Amino acid sequence: MTIVKCKPTSPARRHVIKVVNPELHKGKPFIPLLETISKSGGRNNNGHITTRHVGGGHKQRYRIIDFKRNKDNIAAKIERIEYDPNRSANIALVLYQDGERRYIIAPKGLKVGDQIISGHHATIKTGNTLPIQNIPLGSIVHNVEIKPGKGGQIARSAGASVQIIARDYKYVTLRLRSGEIRRIHSECRATLGEVGNAEHMLRVLGKAGANRWRSIRPTVRGTAMNPVDHPHGGGEGRNFGKHPVSPWGKKTKGKKTRNNRLTDKFIVHRRS
């Protein structure tokens, strides 16, 4: 992994910092594991904007990722590491001994030619997947399930990881990177190691156009608008003299938005 600071040959290149990984596959992705994505532009079926700051961007195809890792007791070899435009983490194409190929999230330290395996009795090794009740305390894991068999939902982005800190008969306690401590069922699966490409956070896009390639449109401040457009709009100067709110008058910047009371009992300590 190399951090490259571009020379200031133009105003757009002056601040660009790239993260270059020479181990990434330079060819095309594995075609049978691709799906088309149609862009919504942030609109719903009525054509109304439901997600602001979305639109345009380069055409992409979705890579079908195996988050469940449920092909047990069949060894697989890492064929190549690839870039995925749909996530911050890199992905790995694995070839199972029975000839099937799947994409997985590429863990840190996993290289081409390495062997991985899933199952209840898999060895404790980076890239292997097994029920979290069979993983030693203190281990670092990623791609953790919340419901058994549903597929990994926690710690899937670049550099993400979770630590196992306690275990009882039916549940395992995890410490998330956010500081939250929560319990999940001991039959849930997790993959050993942390997600690779942690240097993703060091990149600097350098220009607005790089965000537009990623379908991200500009974010206009409420204080820069007129009163008809935003509660913060209008007035002399930049002060709006009230608690920050959304364009629809809902409190923002610190207001709690979580509303899933059924799973509150599994959160031992909220994130700080």
From Swiss-Prot:
Positions of transmembrane segments: none
Keyword RNA-binding appears in the UniProt entry: yes
GO molecular function: rRNA binding; structural constituent of ribosome; transferase activity
Region (Disordered): 222-272
Pfam families: Ribosomal_L2, Ribosomal_L2_C
UniProt keyword annotation of GTP-binding present: no
Biased composition (Basic and acidic residues): 261-272
Biological process annotations from GO: cytoplasmic translation
GO cellular component, one term: large ribosomal subunit
Compositionally biased tracts (Basic residues): 250-259
Lineage: superkingdom: Bacteria
Alphabetic keyword roster: Ribonucleoprotein, Ribosomal protein, RNA-binding, rRNA-binding
Assembly, per entry: Part of the 50S ribosomal subunit. Forms a bridge to the 30S subunit in the 70S ribosome.
Recorded family membership: Belongs to the universal ribosomal protein uL2 family.
Function of the protein: One of the primary rRNA binding proteins. Required for association of the 30S and 50S subunits to form the 70S ribosome, for tRNA binding and peptide bond formation. It has been suggested to have peptidyltransferase activity; this is somewhat controversial. Makes several contacts with the 16S rRNA in the 70S ribosome.
Listed name of the protein: Large ribosomal subunit protein uL2
Organism for this UniProt entry: Baumannia cicadellinicola subsp. Homalodisca coagulata
Gene name for this UniProt entry: rplB
